[in-house]
Amino acid sequence: VALWLLAVGALVASGWSHLRPSVAARTRATDIADLKAPDMGGEAFPAGLALPMLAPYRAAWGERLEFDAYRGSLPMVVDVWASWCPPCVREAPLLEAAWLRLSNRVQFVGVNYRDQRADALAFLDEYALTFPSGEDAAGSTTDELRIFGLPTTLFIDASDRIVGQKIGELDEATLDRLTGRAIGGSRGKDAAP
C-alpha cells in the first residue's frame, strides 16, 4: 500500500504530463481563419486604454499611446501584431499603404503584443511602418480587447463603436471593406475608403 501511495504521489507531483496526450494530440490543427472570435460588433471601444509608445514614434506622437486621444474624432484601425507572426509580416506593407492613403480620414494604431523590444523595433524599421505603435509587453491591453489570435485588426467608427474585426491576415478587399464600414460608422453603411 505504501508503495502504491508513493507511485500515485509521484504521478501527481509530476503533473501527469507524461500520461496525458499533448494539446496537439487532443485538438485538430486549425487555421487561425477558422477560429470564431467573440462578436464585438457594435460594442463600445474600451475607455482608458494606454500603452508605452515604441521609441521611433515618441518624438511625433508622445511617450504614451493614449487611445482616448482619438475617441470621437477619426475612426480607428487598431492592428495587434508581433514580429514573430508570419501573417503580421505579410500584412504590414498593406497596412502602411492604407495608412498613407487614408491618414486624413482614419487613425491607424499598432499594438505590439508581448515582443522583445529589439525585435519589435527591428520589425518597424524593416517594414518602414509610420503609424504609431505601442507595446503591450504584459498583454493587458490585448486581454481588455479580447484578442486571442494574431494578427487581429479592429475597426472602430468615430462614435467609438467596434464595427469590424478580422482575425488573421488581412487582404486588401477586407481591409477596404472594414475600413469603409468604420468611416461610414453611424450612417450604418460602408463608405468608400
Predicted regions and their residues:
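Short, acidic, Ser/Thr-enriched surface-loop or helix-capping motifs
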Residues: 59-61, 156-157
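Conserved segment of the thioredoxin-like fold in thiol-based oxidoreductases
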Residues: 90, 100-138, 150
